[in-house]
């Protein structure tokens, strides 16, 4: 189904042991996207990550009003847990994966973000 209109902003909330420890971090709709990583310097970057996250670990962006998450060649991988079915996807290959509010992103072993609508 083709979506119309403009994608709404997403938020990332950092979770550790089921407790909120950071955020919310607003991610604005953009084809360039926002970078998440230990040394991400771009506008809108999120650097609230654990010690095993790469410098530029993940990109979140929109294309045709659909949100995507893309691993940027991280050393310790990225996993997406889909809220709709609980399926855990390894997205470390760099192929963009569709992202929805309610999903969870795990960067390496120490960083987990809940994806929320804003």
Model region roles, listed by residue range:
Residues 18, 60-61:
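Intrinsically disordered, low-complexity regions enriched in Ser/Pro/Gly/Gln/His and often acidic
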Residues 38, 62, 71-72, 82, ...:
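Residue-level recognition of conserved beta-strand positions in structured domain cores
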Residues 57-59, 65-104:
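Forkhead-associated
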Residues 45-51, 61, 69-71:
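Short histidine-centered beta-strand/loop micro-motifs
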Residues 1-51, 98-104, 109-118:
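Intrinsically disordered, low-complexity acidic Ser/Thr-rich regulatory segments
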């Amino acid at each position: 189904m083709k979506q119309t209109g403009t994608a709404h902003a997403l938020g990332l909330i950092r979770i550790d042991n089921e407790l909120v420890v950071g955020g919310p971090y607003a991610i604005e709709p953009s084809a360039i996207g926002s970078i998440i990583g230990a040394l991400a310097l771009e506008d809108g970057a999120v650097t609230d990550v654990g010690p095993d996250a790469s410098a530029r670990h993940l990109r979140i962006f929109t294309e045709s009003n659909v949100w995507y998450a893309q691993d940027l060649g991280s050393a310790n991988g990225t996993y997406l847990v889909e809220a709709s079915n609980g399926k855990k996807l390894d997205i470390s290959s760099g192929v963009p994966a569709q992202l929805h509010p309610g999903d969870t992103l795990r960067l390496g072993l120490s960083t987990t973000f809940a994806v929320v609508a804003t």
